[in-house]
Amino acid sequence: MKAYKVAVLAGDGIGPLVMKEALKILTFISQKYNFSFEFNEAKIGGASIDAYGVALSDETLKLCEQSDAILFGSVGGPKWDNLPIDQRPERASLLPLRKHFNLFANLRPCKIYESLTHASPLKNEIIQKGVDILCVRELTGGIYFGKQDLGKESAYDTEIYTKKEIERIAHIAFESARIRKKKVHLIDKANVLASSILWREVVANVVKDYQDINLEYMYVDNAAMQIVKNPSIFDVMLCSNLFGDILSDELAAINGSLGLLSSASLNDKGFGLYEPAGGSAPDIAHLNIANPIAQILSAALMLKYSFKEEQAAQDIENAISLALAQGKMTKDLNAKSYLNTDEMGDCILEILKENNNG
């Protein structure tokens, strides 16, 4: 029996609440597909500051090093806002983990469910064609990490990418497309940026190893427009750090709720950190109304990308789709009639059990 070690870092706010539901789903799905999990929990973020004085302790980092993947909740809250910026939970936990494990690829799915078209700001005639997009963003290079200077009269930032950096993120995008609709858009600004010209040259060479993938090019300004005008044309969007940062947030706005958005950050060894895209929402942390779907979908991403358990991941995604189609929703999706956090998790679990028995 295959066994997977997972570092469980629930964090702050709603993190522990929604993490409980994700672990419940993972435990069942592992039994169905005959593999096992070893869940090792540790404090991170504000909870770690309160316990150890730092947002990421050496013990927690060591636990992560001994694991096959990290399932991350959320960190931060007003309680720690008085700390220096570089010591706050958000800055002092997640960013060091990304750097330590060289998590260079960020994957952000965006799917608009048929039962949730009312929650999207897009018109029905746009959504009805289907919206299911994966934004693949390079996370450790580009303009955020280049040389910069801020003077009194001028300032500059430098966008630098190497061939190797582009190649490895391109492989992630093409491999992802293979288990989706086999289409990749490279998002760039090759009409004015030298770095974008290099991206096109390198990606055009990498795609030769993926004859089954359809590669297209699109300028980033046009891509920003097409996301709201004709999003169904996209499958996988391959982006540099800056462009991916902007477009992934635009994608987050069109699906209707942060409670549905999952995220994966990967290195070249298949190790990943999986987390909801939303925040810790401390204002509702003790109300049992947080949407656990983003955390559960993050767990499904872990199954898919770190453990290659694609069918198990698909089962979870299908169960979520069915639950939503049945009108089972949390308060962020339907304020008039809603399930609590644990009830939503139970609903998804019951659908998985019914399909298993069927």
UniProtKB/Swiss-Prot annotation:
**Which pathway does the database say it acts in?**
Amino-acid biosynthesis; L-leucine biosynthesis; L-leucine from 3-methyl-2-oxobutanoate: step 3/4
* Record protein name field: 3-isopropylmalate dehydrogenase
What gene, per UniProt, encodes this protein? leuB
The cross-references to InterPro entries, in alphabetical order and at most eight, read:
IsoCit/isopropylmalate_DH_CS, IsoPropMal-DH-like_dom, Isopropylmalate_DH
Q: Which family does it belong to?
A: Belongs to the isocitrate and isopropylmalate dehydrogenases family. LeuB type 1 subfamily.
Per the record, the major location class is: cytoplasm
What SUPFAM superfamilies is this protein classified in? Isocitrate/Isopropylmalate dehydrogenase-like
Check the record and name the SMART domains matching this protein. Answer: Iso_dh
Q: What does this protein do?
A: Catalyzes the oxidation of 3-carboxy-2-hydroxy-4-methylpentanoate (3-isopropylmalate) to 3-carboxy-4-methyl-2-oxopentanoate. The product decarboxylates to 4-methyl-2 oxopentanoate.
**CC cofactor:** Mg(2+); Mn(2+)
According to its UniProt entry, this protein's organism is Campylobacter jejuni (strain RM1221)
